[in-house]
Design a protein with these regions (language model features):
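A glycine-/small-polar-enriched, mobile loop at the entrance of the PLP active site in fold-type I
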Residues: 2-50, 54
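Active-site-proximal loop->helix
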Residues: 82-93, 111
Length: 237
C-alpha cells in the first residue's frame, strides 16, 4: 500500500469540507462507526484517529500499560521491530520472540514464554498480524489463544495490512487491541487510523500511567458516544 483508491471515493473527497461539529458530520460518524464494528467483527467501539497506523498502535500500547510493565513482542519484520522500539521508548520491559524476515513467528515460542510466566508478569503480547515489510501472515488466532490461556495478558495486534483484506474476527479471537490504517484494506488515502479496544483493554486503561494527550483514547471514547471527535479530524477522509 497505499492501495488503489476507487474513483467514487476520490470524487467524494473532493467535496467542500463540512463542519466537524455539524449534525451532518455526526450522522456520517454514526453510520461509519457501525460499519467499522462490522468490519472488525466486534461489539466494541472502534475509534478513529487522524494519523497513521503507527498512531493507532502507539495508542493501543500507551493506553493499556504502565511504566515498567513487562511485554512480549513479536519481531519478524520492520513493523514488529517498530513496536519493540515504541515499547522501549515508554519504559516498558520488553522480551522479544524473533523470526527471520520472510518467515512467520513461531506460535510455540509464545506458548512457552507465556506458560513459563507463572507470576503473571507479562502484561501484554504485542505483534503484527500481516508484516507489511515482507507480506508474511503471522498466526494471530493461535497466538491470541495462548495469551488467553495465560489469563491476564492482553493481545495488542497491528492489523494495518490485514484488516479488510483478511478475516480478523476481533471478538471471536479474543483480541484486546486491534489497530489499522486507512491506506490498506480500506482502500482510502493515508491519513486515518483506527483502534478498537476490548472491555479488558478498557479496564487496563483505568490504571495505565504512561504519558499521553493526543493519543489518550478516553476522550475519543467519550466523544464517540456523541458521534463526535475530541480534535479536528480529517473530515474529507
Amino acid at each position: 500500500g497505499p492501495t488503489p483508491v476507487p474513483e467514487t471515493v476520490l470524487k467524494a473527497m473532493g467535496r467542500h469540507p463540512i463542519g466537524h461539529r455539524s449534525g451532518e458530520f455526526q450522522t456520517i460518524v454514526r453510520r461509519t462507526t457501525e460499519q467499522l464494528k462490522w468490519l472488525h467483527q466486534t461489539s466494541s467501539d472502534v475509534l478513529v484517529i487522524t494519523g497513521s497506523g503507527t498512531a493507532a498502535m502507539e495508542a493501543g500500547i500507551i493506553n493499556t500499560l504502565s511504566r515498567g510493565d513487562k511485554v512480549l513482542c513479536g519481531d519478524n519484520g520492520k513493523f514488529g521491530e517498530r513496536w519493540v522500539k515504541v515499547a522501549r521508548a515508554y519504559g516498558l520491559e520488553v522480551d522479544v520472540v524473533t523470526a527471520e524476515w520472510g518467515h512467520p513467528l513461531d506460535t510455540e515460542a509464545f506458548r512457552t514464554a507465556l506458560e513459563a510466566d507463572t507470576e503473571k508478569q507479562i502484561k501484554a503480547v504485542i505483534l503484527t498480524h500481516s508484516e507489511t515489510s515482507t507480506g508474511v501472515i503471522n498466526d494471530l488466532e493461535t497466538i491470541a489463544r495462548h495469551v488467553k490461556a495465560h489469563g491476564t495478558a492482553l493481545t495488542i495486534a497491528d492489523c494495518v495490512t490485514s484488516l479488510g483484506a483478511c478475516n480478523v474476527p476481533m471478538d471471536e479471537w479474543g483480541l484486546d487491541v486491534v489497530a489499522s490504517g486507512s491506506q490498506k484494506g480500506y482502500m482510502l488515502p493515508p491519513g486515518l487510523s483506527f483502534v478498537a479496544m476490548s472491555d479488558r483493554a478498557w479496564a487496563a486503561y483505568a490504571t495505565s500511567d504512561l504519558p499521553k494527550f493526543y493519543l489518550d483514547l478516553g476522550p475519543y471514547r467519550k466523544t464517540a458516544a456523541k458521534d463526535s471527535n475530541p480534535f479536528t479530524p480529517a473530515v474529507n477522509l
